[in-house]
Swiss-Prot record:
Keywords, in A-Z order: Isomerase, Nucleus, Phosphoprotein, RNA-binding, Rotamase
Reaction it catalyzes: [protein]-peptidylproline (omega=180) = [protein]-peptidylproline (omega=0)
Modified residues (Phosphoserine): S206
Localization in the cell: Nucleus
The protein's Enzyme Commission number: 5.2.1.8
RRM domain span: 244-322
Family label: Belongs to the cyclophilin-type PPIase family. PPIL4 subfamily.
Recorded superkingdom: Eukaryota
Annotated source species: Schizosaccharomyces pombe (strain 972 / ATCC 24843) (Fission yeast)
Protein name: Peptidyl-prolyl cis-trans isomerase cyp6
InterPro entries, A to Z: CRIP, Cyclophilin-like_dom_sf, Cyclophilin-type_PPIase_dom, Cyclophilin_PPIL4, Nucleotide-bd_a/b_plait_sf, RBD_domain_sf, RRM_dom
Pfam family, one: Pro_isomerase
Expression induction: Induced during the meiotic cycle.
GO terms, biological process: regulation of transcription by RNA polymerase II
Length: 432
């Protein structure tokens, strides 16, 4: 006993609790068979709580009708069915919306066609008012999209979320005699079309071709600037040329810096005027840069000096687009920082790794030389003590060339008296 509901944001498969709520399930199945829910909007969407649908006109409708009223054989509503075993304890439970009518005994809860779907867990507070008759078996991603919809203060989404089709997968109930299933989905009525806010395929922000072209140009310029920064032609991607520099080209090769400065000085104070020349030959490249103290002077010169004849040559002026000066300044600062960093590194390594200059090395060498001499004195003292202890007479070492028979090949004393003075543990066997 299942129904497939196709919406504008995805599909939902609802399994019905036929045994626990038979009349409610029958009403829902027969309304789906009559295509009553087609084009019904989702409204009253409360984030992480519930969403409501089932009225063909949405929040402006009359609340909907039950299937027996649609077939002109019954009242508009029927009594709500509550089952104590069914509670709102998880996401995806389907319940009927109820209305309260007065009866002779007490107030009575009745149902029509509207239903709600829970969008969160542990909503037991709905048990006393909304009777459960089904649960979502598939399509929880669709529920998440409905839950995340952008809505107004009343919970109605700005972009319409509607039921497109309802397909019955299993129906255990017999159809009423007057129920005739339509051959096709009915077209929406004019009243339903009047409730449309933003359609499914409607663009929220329409972009003209001019805006799209402008956006593409900006993105392309941004990419080119980043590329120039990476290869080193620009100091940084968003660098802008100076506004107080005028570019002059098509100059006569004989035109000098002083000539241009004299001609353009009537438009304002000139900070610098430079004709660009070849680095090797010094010949003029026939263009120059003139830097004024303010932007207004550049604009005056631009409008007044276009195609003016200077030294039999008509010049062309424009606002400068060069950032070479910024690049030179950036490179000089970068090199200065690098050199400072390298000097700091050298100082750090000199102190931490024990690297000294030549003068310090000489001082340490002298210090180590004195220590070595002191060690030599101590070693001679130890040798003297050793000789006295073992009776090793070093005077025999002076008889290297005397041919003394009491000395061995190593000029050591080999007399019997000396041998017996050694400890027995170190005595050689050949002397026994």
């Amino acid at each position: 006993m299942s129904v497939l509901i196709e919406t504008t944001v995805g599909d939902l498969v609802i399994d019905l609790f036929v045994k626990e709520a038979p009349k409610t399930c029958e009403n829902f199945l027969k309304l789906c068979k009559l295509k009553y829910y087609n084009f019904c909007p989702f409204y009253n969407i409360q984030h992480n709580y519930t969403c409501q649908t089932g009225d063909p006109l949405g929040p402006t409708g009359d609340g909907g009708r039950c299937v027996w009223n649609v077939l002109n054989k019954g009242t508009r509503f029927f009594k709500a069915e509550f089952n104590p075993s069914l509670v709102h304890n998880k996401m995806g439970l389907v319940s009927m919306s109820t209305a309260t009518i007065s009866s002779r005994d007490d107030k009575l809860l009745v149902c029509g066609s509207q239903f709600i779907i829970t969008l969160s867990d542990n909503l037991e507070g709905l048990d006393e008012r909304y009777p459960i008759y089904g649960q979502v078996a598939e399509g929880f991603d669709t529920l998440l999209k409905i839950n995340d919809a952008i809505c107004d203060e009343e919970g109605q989404p700005y972009r319409d979320i509607r039921i497109k089709h309802t397909i019955i997968l299993d129906d255990p109930f017999e159809d009423p005699p007057d129920l005739v299933e339509p051959l096709r989905s009915p077209s929406p009525t004019p009243e339903q079309l009047a409730t449309v806010r933003i359609g499914e395929n409607e663009q929220i922000e329409s972009e003209t071709s001019e805006d799209k072209l402008q956006r593409e140009k900006e993105m392309e310029a941004e990419a080119e600037a980043v590329t120039l920064e990476m290869i080193g032609d620009l100091p940084f991607a968003h660098v802008a040329p100076p506004e107080n520099v005028l570019f002059v080209c098509k100059l006569n090769p004989v035109t000098q810096d002083e000539d241009l400065e004299l001609i353009f000085s009537r438009f304002g104070k000139i900070i610098s005027c430079q004709v660009i020349r070849d680095k090797e030959t010094g010949d003029s490249l026939q263009y120059a840069f003139i830097e004024f103290d303010n932007k207004e002077s550049v604009e005056k010169a631009y409008f007044k000096m276009q195609n003016v004849l200077i030294d039999d040559s008509r010049i062309h002026v424009d606002f400068s687009q060069s950032v070479a000066r910024y690049r030179q300044y950036y490179n000089s600062n970068r090199d200065r920082k690098r050199s400072s960093s390298r000097s700091d590194d050298r100082e750090y390594h000199r102190r931490s790794d024990g690297r000294y200059d030549r003068s310090n090395y000489r001082d340490d060498y002298r210090h180590r030389r004195k220590e070595r001499d002191h060690r030599d004195d101590q070693s001679s003292f130890r040798n003297e003590r050793f000789s006295n202890y073992y009776g090793d007479d070093r005077s025999y070492h002076k008889r290297r060339n005397t041919g003394n028979k009491n000395c061995d090949d190593h000029l050591r004393d080999k007399s019997p008296e000396r041998r017996y003075r050694y400890d027995r543990r170190y005595r050689d066997d050949r002397y026994r």
